[in-house]
Amino acid sequence: MRVKLKKVWLIRHTESEANVGGRTSDPAAIPLTAKGRLQAEQLVAAFIEKPSLIVSSRYLRAKQTAQPVRNKFKRVRYEEWDVHEFTFISPDRCHDTTKPEREPLVDAYWQRCDPNYCDGKGAESFSDFMGRVCGALKQLKERDAAFCAVFSHMQFITAVLWRLEDPSRPIDSKAMKDYQLRLDRNPLPNGSITEVLLDSIGN
């Protein structure tokens, strides 16, 4: 039996205020910069083919990136899924901070290398994050959409790609370290599009 492949575009949001060193408090409310809004408009040109489904995370910067594509394809179904960024530091601990000011907290988190550790309110553990990634892959597998455009975030997209390489890998400290190395060595540019093909069993 021939397996029908589904095309998925994993699109990182365009330039945000956090990306250029702006002070932020709520991870969900970080907006795009003026440059990021222009980049979002330019993304539309990549869509030669009409998508079957447009998906975005609930975070503002992803929704703003998706908006020009939604404007072009007004009749295409749009949904918001749990494909938001991995927030592993509690927002309460980094209110009104810049990326450099958060770096000691970030370094401490990865050095701990405990997949079950949760930093506090508004944060999630690495294990829970990977559960969310697997949940999104399951949704993509189950939806009747030949071409799905997913507007998401660098850590989430990297996790999807990493998980697809070895779906049965246990989520332990070794896996967490491997993921971190992948993230550090292969950063995704703002506005980048990564295409994956999923078969009928989600691989």
Task: Set out the residue ranges of the language-model regions.
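Acidic, low-complexity terminal tails and accessory targeting/binding regions
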Residues: 2-6, 75, 86-100, 162-203
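Active-site-proximal alpha-helix that buttresses catalytic centers in soluble enzyme cores
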Residues: 2-78
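Generic beta-sheet signal
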Residues: 8, 52, 144-154
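Phosphate-handling substructures
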Residues: 31, 71-135, 184
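Conserved histidine-centered catalytic loops in small-molecule metabolism enzymes
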Residues: 49-82, 104-112, 162, 189-203
